UniProtKB/Swiss-Prot annotation:
Subcellular localization: Cytoplasm
Job of this protein: Sulfur carrier protein which probably makes part of a sulfur-relay system.
HAMAP family associated with the record: Thiourid_synth_A (MF_00413)
PROSITE patterns per UniProt: UPF0033 (PS01148)
Residues at the catalytic site: 20
The protein's name: Sulfur carrier protein TusA
One Gene Ontology term of the molecular function aspect: sulfur carrier activity
Keyword tags: Cytoplasm
Family to which the UniProt record says this protein belongs: Belongs to the sulfur carrier protein TusA family.
């Protein structure tokens, strides 16, 4: 399988500089706009997203394909559930 950074995405959410709860609120809107099975890349700088985004995915049954940290930036690849 490809590395997440090489996978084509259906949308990107840049939440750089935003603090809780804004990244998750924006994520909710962006994921809603994706087609079922669509892949969203999220870029964030708020450390609380390490806790909040995985919980968001579990609660709403989306797949957290991968998450990475690169020099204080948090990257997430989320596949929208197909329901």
């Amino acid at each position: 399988m490809s590395h997440p950074e090489e996978m084509p995405v259906d949308g990107t959410l840049d939440a750089t500089g935003l603090n809780c709860p804004e990244p998750v609120m924006m994520l909710h809107q962006h994921i809603r706009d994706l087609p079922p099975g669509g892949l969203l890349k999220v870029i964030a700088t708020d450390p609380s997203t390490r806790r909040d985004i995985p919980k968001f995915c579990v609660f709403l049954d989306h797949e957290l394909v991968d998450q990475q940290e690169q020099a204080g930036t948090y990257l997430y690849w989320i596949r929208k559930n197909s329901v």
